A protein has these predicted regions:
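An anion-binding catalytic pocket shared by soluble metabolic enzymes
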Residues: 18, 22-25, 29-121, 128-139
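Short acidic/polar capping segments at secondary-structure boundaries
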Residues: 73, 125-128, 135-136, 159-161, ...
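Divalent metal-coordination and catalytic microenvironments
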Residues: 57, 110, 124, 171, ...
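A conserved C-terminal secondary-structure "cap"
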Residues: 2-38, 179-258
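Short coil/turn connectors at secondary-structure junctions
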Residues: 62-64, 80-81, 114-118, 143, ...
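A general structural signal for well-ordered alpha-helical packing
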Residues: 107, 128, 168-172, 202
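A contiguous binding-surface segment within folded domains or other stable secondary-structure elements
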Residues: 153-189
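Class I SAM-dependent methyltransferase SAM-binding "motif I" and its flanking Rossmann-like core
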Residues: 126-163, 167
Length: 258
């Protein structure tokens, strides 16, 4: 869904869904808009105020390259024009400036290993980072956690500052075919078949981590109930819907990124 339509659309409903890509150029713009909006959503909570955090979006044509925010741009000021395109070797393809080096080392192997992943997001949050010190998967103790039932991994390495692609590959391996990887003593990372769903599910992960931190001995949802609920709350479309709500409630006018 383009931000132009989102800005004036009054028909957002349970049946809303992403518009099919018309051409690579249009799809590229949507991915870049969602990326810039994702950064602004993070900023609305104060996440990434110190520059720690990154969102990436695979290019629809240069599938061996991804877009991310130019280093030095405050997340709350992110615009489409502030994104740069780099390939999996780190070469700058389009735009000017650099991207977060840890972001490159973490995200490049994920995009390379997982061709189904369009968007990926990681930052340091009030509950995701404390929970990550457990070096354990999220417990199924909330509805939000069920979105990751059978779809999460744990990277237990002690490289809390990722500075090389080899460590990033180990993170990608820990993620496997899942949607969430807990980076021990570091934070959370989610992926999606769109930038929108990756960001939407990141909020789910943060909320699930909050429950786990605040109520560590709370009741855990049974495997049977989690398996029954997962197809609805864990659907990619649900992640996309969460993103639409976040844009409306946390950003307001989505055209600010254009």
């Amino acid at each position: 869904m383009s931000t132009e339509k989102l800005a004036s659309d009054t028909s957002f409903s349970l049946s809303s869904a992403p518009e099919p890509a018309i051409c690579p150029e249009a799809e590229r713009l949507v991915r870049k808009q969602e990326t810039a909006l994702g950064y602004r959503i993070m900023a609305s909570w104060g996440w990434g105020a110190d520059g720690s955090g990154h969102i990436t979006a695979r290019d629809p044509e240069r599938t061996d390259a991804f877009w991310s925010l130019r280093y030095g741009v405050p997340f709350g000021e992110a615009r489409v024009e502030d994104l740069v395109l780099v390939d999996h070797s780190g070469d700058l393809i389009e735009g000017s400036g650099e991207i977060n080096p840890a972001g490159f080392c973490i995200h490049a192997p994920i995009h390379s290993t997982r061709p189904d992943v369009v968007g990926a997001i990681h930052t340091h949050t009030p509950y995701g980072t404390p929970f990550s010190a457990m070096a354990a998967p999220l417990p199924m103790s909330s509805q939000e956690a069920v979105a990751f039932y059978g779809m999460q991994g744990v990277f237990a390495g002690e490289e809390v500052n990722v500075t090389d692609l080899a460590t990033g590959q180990r993170i990608a391996d820990a993620l496997g075919t899942g949607r969430l990887v807990v980076l021990a003593n570091h934070g959370l990372l989610t992926v999606g078949t769109s930038v929108a769903s990756a960001v939407g599910f990141y909020l789910n992960a943060e909320r699930a981590a909050e429950v786990a931190v605040k109520v560590p001995d709370g009741r855990v949802i049974s495997p049977a109930a989690a398996a029954q609920t997962h197809p609805s709350v864990g659907d990619e479309l649900n992640g996309w819907h969460i993103f639409q709500w976040l844009v409306r409630s946390r950003v307001g006018d989505p055209t600010v990124v254009n």
